[in-house]
Amino acid sequence: MKYMIPDEEFIRREGVPITKEEIRAVSIGKLNLNKDDVVVDVGCGSGGMTVEIAKRCKFVYAIDYLDGAIEVTKQNLAKFNIKNCQIIKGRAEDVLDKLEFNKAFIGGTKNIEKIIEILDKKKINHIVANTIVLENAAKIINEFESRGYNVDAVNVFISYAKKIPSGHMFLAKNPITIIKAVR
């Protein structure tokens, strides 16, 4: 098994983001997955994290409210022959209560306080949340800490080398804050 599937192997759709390969690697590491885990992927987007999580655990619930995200996630699950996943169209705060899982990955941060509240009430003790927005990082950290979680946050900067006439230069991508909350 490849450690991480290269970005270019995923089916993409304009306007539906995919978590970059290196960010997926760090996020998967922070999730500390094992074969018995049942994981919810909140804001599944293009399904990059959904596919990578499903390769490493028992089952994944992939949630998104955007039609485009649901469609491209379905395509990526089919492409990589992922069978241990259920895609749910809807808002996480409306469906999380109905699901049984022991870990959560949050890639979409709309209504984050409500999502964390539900995860807390469900006694989910291992959560990883990714955000590109600085204010959301602070909000997520504060929300977890106020609920008694131990929080570990890392800001990851990825740069890719590009050949130029005089050699190579690095082109930076947007930094991502990866927040792990456990108790």
Curated annotation (Swiss-Prot):
Annotated source species: Methanocaldococcus jannaschii (strain ATCC 43067 / DSM 2661 / JAL-1 / JCM 10045 / NBRC 100440)
Annotated GO biological process: anaerobic cobalamin biosynthetic process; methylation
Alphabetical list of Gene3D superfamilies matching this protein: Vaccinia Virus protein VP39
Protein name: Probable cobalt-precorrin-6B C(15)-methyltransferase (decarboxylating)
E.C. number(s) listed in UniProt: 2.1.1.196
Entry binding sites for S-adenosyl-L-methionine: T19, G43, C44, G45, S46, G47, D64, A92
Listed PANTHER family: COBALT-PRECORRIN-6B C(15)-METHYLTRANSFERASE (DECARBOXYLATING), COBALT-PRECORRIN-7 C(5)-METHYLTRANSFERASE
Gene Ontology molecular function, alphabetical: cobalt-precorrin-6B C5-methyltransferase activity; protein methyltransferase activity
Superkingdom of source: Archaea
Pathway: Cofactor biosynthesis; adenosylcobalamin biosynthesis; cob(II)yrinate a,c-diamide from sirohydrochlorin (anaerobic route): step 8/10
Keywords: Cobalamin biosynthesis, Methyltransferase, S-adenosyl-L-methionine, Transferase
Reaction(s) this enzyme catalyzes, per UniProt: Co-precorrin-6B + S-adenosyl-L-methionine = Co-precorrin-7 + S-adenosyl-L-homocysteine + CO2
Family designation: Belongs to the methyltransferase superfamily. Archaeal-type CbiT family.
